[in-house]
């Protein structure tokens, strides 16, 4: 079974959980790749797609909600000054990623605030580089909670203002004609269970 998803999702959310799947389903071999485009699913080179619900899919692909997308500022625990309010971020060095250049603007709008210079700060190509820069004390980053859960757990990063829902979610994409295939059902069911366990407890 071939799963395609963004590299940041694979590295930070799925790969840390793969051993659990292999223990539960040793007869299902998984391959991971980053060609997370609907065309790969339609051509048959990919069995399961994981992507943001903000991306449109053709009618032939069934979309199944997986994880609510929440985002928030993260920084090193000893980084100073730590922001105590959303407004305080306006004067602090912010980190950006090319893969989601509008992340800060979307977060600020959700908070009901605006920054005079939204593009202020360092721009990095990949989320992993941005998070490493944040952990190294180079500024404050903006990232989904599910992609920083390991770094938060290890104490390399903190989320001083918490996370807020973006209105989107990560979703599973499968061909509608294949939804009853046993291995796909097992895989989708396992991913859904893992997602449920990862959701913050209310």
Model-derived segments and spans:
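Central regulatory/effector-binding core of bacterial HTH transcription factors
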Residues: 1-57
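Hydrophobic hinge/microswitch elements
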Residues: 5, 116-159, 165
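Acidic, Gly/Pro-rich loop/turn segments at junctions of secondary structure
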Residues: 33-95, 99-102, 108-123
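Alpha-helix/helix-capping structural signal
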Residues: 7-8, 77-78, 99-102, 128, ...
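A late-sequence structural motif
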Residues: 162-201
């Amino acid at each position: 079974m071939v799963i395609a998803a963004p590299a940041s999702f694979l590295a930070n959310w799925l790969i840390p959980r793969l051993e659990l799947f292999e223990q539960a389903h040793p007869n299902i071999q998984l391959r991971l790749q980053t060609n997370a485009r609907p065309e790969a699913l339609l051509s048959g080179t990919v069995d399961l797609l994981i992507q943001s619900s903000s991306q449109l899919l053709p009618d032939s692909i069934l979309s199944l909600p997986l994880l609510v997308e929440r985002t928030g500022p993260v920084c090193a625990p000893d980084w100073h000054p730590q922001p105590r309010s959303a407004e305080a971020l306006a004067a602090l060095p912010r980190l950006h990623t090319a893969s989601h250049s509008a992340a800060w603007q979307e977060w600020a709008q959700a908070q009901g605030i605006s920054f005079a210079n939204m593009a202020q700060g360092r721009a990095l190509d990949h989320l992993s580089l941005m998070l490493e820069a944040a952990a190294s004390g180079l500024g404050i980053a903006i990232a989904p909670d599910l992609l920083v859960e390991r770094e938060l757990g290890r104490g390399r990063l903190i989320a001083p203002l918490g996370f807020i829902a973006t209105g989107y979610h990560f979703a599973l994409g499968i061909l509608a004609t294949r939804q009853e295939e046993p291995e796909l059902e097992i895989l989708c069911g396992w991913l859904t269970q893992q997602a449920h366990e990862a959701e913050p407890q209310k």
